[in-house]
């Protein structure tokens, strides 16, 4: 999504796991892009290096929310949703969330995050309920969102299926052995 948008407008991606080298930032497709793509990476604050995983995430979220200077904020996963929600409130900027999974339907995360699961669930719930728009990647995901967050206005939840970069795919030749596999399982 960011590469396609960057063909038309300036896009800044704020990411976890530290700064990015210029070589790691994808090139913008097209011959004459009208925008740009910038990736800014954030590290966990030193004071939180030994903290619970959710608190580490919150530390990065606070940095991201503080730095946002945008016309619109797009977030996905609870990691980014808290940063998006905080930035929305701090900078009065519209927030759009794309849902790929939902914390209430991933209870095994309690084992991974311990009490941090309560924090991740809270962060996601608040972000969804205050988002200006929520994008579900399927009709089933839309139903799950409305089940998990019944206070969310259903009119704010729309379905937009995941996309692919068509230029990265090509139809195999007629004699490609992959067709036999396709025919067997199709």
Model-derived segments and spans:
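A short helix/loop element that forms part of the nucleotide-sugar donor recognition site in Leloir-type
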Residues: 170-186
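N-terminal subdomain of nucleotide-sugar transferases
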Residues: 1-31
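Short His-centered aromatic/hydrophobic patch
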Residues: 75-80, 99
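A short beta-strand/loop micro-motif in the catalytic core of glycosyltransferases
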Residues: 73-74, 129-139
């Amino acid at each position: 999504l960011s590469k396609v948008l960057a063909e038309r407008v300036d896009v800044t991606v704020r990411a976890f796991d530290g700064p990015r080298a210029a070589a790691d930032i994808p090139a913008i497709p097209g011959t004459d892009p009208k925008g740009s793509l910038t990736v800014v990476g954030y590290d966990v604050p030193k004071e939180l290096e030994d903290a619970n995983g959710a608190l580490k995430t919150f530390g990065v979220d606070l940095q991201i929310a503080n730095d946002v200077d945008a016309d619109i904020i797009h977030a996905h996963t609870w990691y980014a949703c808290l940063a998006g929600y905080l930035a929305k409130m701090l900078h009065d900027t519209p927030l759009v969330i794309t849902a790929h999974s939902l914390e209430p339907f991933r209870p095994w995360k309690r084992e991974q995050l311990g009490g941090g699961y309560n924090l991740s669930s809270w962060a996601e719930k608040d972000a969804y309920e205050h988002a200006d728009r929520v994008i579900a990647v399927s009709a089933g995901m839309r139903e799950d969102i409305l089940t998990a967050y019944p206070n969310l206005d259903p009119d704010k939840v729309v379905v937009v299926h995941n996309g692919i970069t068509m230029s990265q795919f090509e139809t195999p030749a007629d004699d490609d052995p992959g067709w036999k596999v396709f025919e067997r399982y199709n």
